[in-house]
């Protein structure tokens, strides 16, 4: 038993230059943990609350001094004296102290910082890597990455409707090889864009946002880049994309619109599903995220019934890493995968519960970054600890993204012959892929 003796939070900056919370936690036997909390740009309406100050004279209202104050006062008093290895007790203590269903009193950014710092301090104290401390001796599966190399929708200023276009090195034999394949394709894509006179500046997640006219052009460009890098589309590197459909849904008329490329065009759920199905039939796509609005549960049922056997269907805004929404989805036969974002739910314990529930129901789990990231690499350890098998952590540029890939390669080296990279077999619940 090792007691927490001190907790200290401060306001620091994330990868977008916006304030975020950093927490340091100390134990009586010399254990130390530090954690930084990420932040999302496009967020689901059911996510846990990210507490901001609202003072327009500081950081345009985005300061986090209130959250920092809650850590340094109420939360610190509650967790000091607890055993640092009692993760569930630490997390539940904070949840109970907050007392709201969405962590609206203290903020999920305050609570998550303490939750992650405690886990790191416990791992430090027992002398284990974080992934091994969290996952035990069976933590050995390295994830297949989703690399966001092209951006559209709300993440760009072009007329591409879908928000993210990703490559997945499904044919790699290791994380190290997957990272190399991704890097080579990223640079091939950059060269193609330059040759076309397009913009090659990168966005929040390290991907390009060139002036493309529509989704079709984005898919064609990725296939061309994969070939240019010397790989076979589909066999070596497959495609994935995030529709972010909630950005294009009108709840009143129950229709979708191609908001950026052709805002006057309206689609019923069936027509929208058919449009996406057309892309999946034409291109080597293995995963689609948020194809339907987060509140259109009937639409999700329609989409899953038609597409569930041919592609991974990931719920992000739909599930927000929350077991209540995930259980509803499982009961309704909605989606077949969940995106896992630590700050959507706000504690490590609840994150583990969501991953476990997904696995028990035969859903895959994709551990994910946020658009506002930091140098913190916890999600790399988390995805190995849980043997989740897939990670979404940005493109092949920006240190805040690369830090996670570098950590995965370190973990793979540490595991040696015990490590397992599943590649295409990460989609174990989709008949047409595995």
Curated annotation (Swiss-Prot):
Protein name: Enolase
One GO location term (cellular component): phosphopyruvate hydratase complex
EC id: 4.2.1.11
Keywords annotated in UniProt: Cytoplasm, Glycolysis, Lyase, Magnesium, Metal-binding, Secreted
Entry binding sites for Mg(2+): 242, 289, 316
Cofactor: Mg(2+)
Function: Catalyzes the reversible conversion of 2-phosphoglycerate (2-PG) into phosphoenolpyruvate (PEP). It is essential for the degradation of carbohydrates via glycolysis.
Active-site residues, record numbering mapped to chain: 205 (proton donor), 341 (proton acceptor)
Gene3D superfamilies listed in its UniProt record: Enolase-like C-terminal domain (3.20.20.120), Enolase-like, N-terminal domain (3.30.390.10)
BP-aspect Gene Ontology terms: glycolytic process
InterPro entries reported for this sequence: Enolase, Enolase-like_C_sf, Enolase-like_N, Enolase_C, Enolase_CS, Enolase_N
Pathway named in the protein's UniProt entry: Carbohydrate degradation; glycolysis; pyruvate from D-glyceraldehyde 3-phosphate: step 4/5
Subcellular location: Cytoplasm; Secreted; Cell surface
Binding positions for (2R)-2-phosphoglycerate per the UniProt entry: 163, 341, 370-371, 392
Catalytic reaction equation(s): (2R)-2-phosphoglycerate = phosphoenolpyruvate + H2O
GO MF: magnesium ion binding; phosphopyruvate hydratase activity
Tagged with keyword RNA-binding: no
Family: Belongs to the enolase family.
Cofactor stoichiometry and binding remark: Binds a second Mg(2+) ion via substrate during catalysis.
Group of enzyme by EC: lyase
